[in-house]
């Protein structure tokens, strides 16, 4: 059972209590924490759209601590990040692996960061399918298309050549915050506010 801290604020009408995530959302901070899956993606997309409707000129901050997860769920978040008007500041706290790293890199150029002890990992998409040979072939072709799309987007966001991205994502590729900065996944390593 997880406990979510509450924040109590004084207002002109008395006290108002919020869970900590709702309070931070008021400050345009979204937490992307845990496995990237459909339910989480729907919540993140809804928060992004809400914050855009509140003020399309103010940056939105996404704090990422994720081992990765579903490609389709992650692409729903990514496409929304690219679609909406506000700039997206991404910050890796803890880890940004697989789809988490992809979303970290997908923040607005110049506004992507990692904390000093954060870890980032990129790799090719994982797939597994059982069934008839013809269905396995269809799924294999689909995962190759997804791999090409992810590599193309990573090349765009990092400035690396597509050949380098293909080589570097062939296996799990772990990086420190400084290595992620040198690679182009983030723009800076934050040490102090």
Curated annotation (Swiss-Prot):
Molecular function in Gene Ontology: ATP-dependent peptidase activity; ATPase binding; serine-type endopeptidase activity
Entry EC number(s)? 3.4.21.92
Which reaction does this chain catalyze?
Answer: Hydrolysis of proteins to small peptides in the presence of ATP and magnesium. alpha-casein is the usual test substrate. In the absence of ATP, only oligopeptides shorter than five residues are hydrolyzed (such as succinyl-Leu-Tyr-|-NHMec, and Leu-Tyr-Leu-|-Tyr-Trp, in which cleavage of the -Tyr-|-Leu- and -Tyr-|-Trp bonds also occurs)
Q: What is its main location?
A: cytoplasm
**Keyword Hydrolase assigned:** yes
Q: Which residues form the active site?
A: 98, 123
**Biological-process GO terms, alphabetical:** protein quality control for misfolded or incompletely synthesized proteins
Location in the cell reads: Cytoplasm
Cross-referenced InterPro entries: ClpP, ClpP/crotonase-like_dom_sf, ClpP/TepA, ClpP_His_AS, ClpP_Ser_AS
CDD domains, per the entry = S14_ClpP_2
Ribonucleoprotein keyword on record: no
Question: Keyword annotations for this protein?
Answer: Cytoplasm, Hydrolase, Protease, Serine protease
The family note in this entry says: Belongs to the peptidase S14 family.
Subunit details for this protein? Fourteen ClpP subunits assemble into 2 heptameric rings which stack back to back to give a disk-like structure with a central cavity, resembling the structure of eukaryotic proteasomes.
The free-text function statement in the UniProt record for this protein reads:
Cleaves peptides in various proteins in a process that requires ATP hydrolysis. Has a chymotrypsin-like activity. Plays a major role in the degradation of misfolded proteins.
Protein name in UniProt: ATP-dependent Clp protease proteolytic subunit
């Amino acid at each position: 059972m997880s406990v979510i801290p509450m924040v109590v604020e004084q207002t002109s009408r008395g006290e108002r209590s919020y869970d900590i995530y709702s309070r931070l959302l008021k400050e345009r901070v979204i937490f992307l924490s845990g496995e990237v899956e459909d339910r989480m993606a729907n919540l993140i997309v809804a928060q992004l759209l809400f914050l855009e409707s509140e003020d399309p000129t103010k940056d939105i901050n996404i704090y990422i601590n994720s081992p990765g997860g579903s490609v389709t769920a992650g692409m729903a978040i990514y496409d929304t990040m690219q679609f909406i008007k506000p700039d997206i500041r991404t910050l890796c706290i803890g880890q940004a692996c697989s789809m988490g790293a992809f979303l970290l890199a997908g923040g607005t150029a110049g506004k992507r960061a990692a904390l000093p002890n954060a870890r980032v990992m990129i790799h090719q998409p994982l797939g597994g399918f059982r069934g008839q040979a013809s269905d396995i072939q269809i799924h294999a072709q689909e995962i190759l298309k997804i791999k090409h799309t992810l590599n193309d987007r990573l090349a765009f966001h990092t400035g690396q050549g597509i050949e380098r991205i293909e080589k570097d994502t062939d296996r799990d590729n772990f990086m420190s915050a400084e290595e992620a900065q040198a690679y182009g996944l983030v723009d800076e390593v934050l040490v102090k506010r």
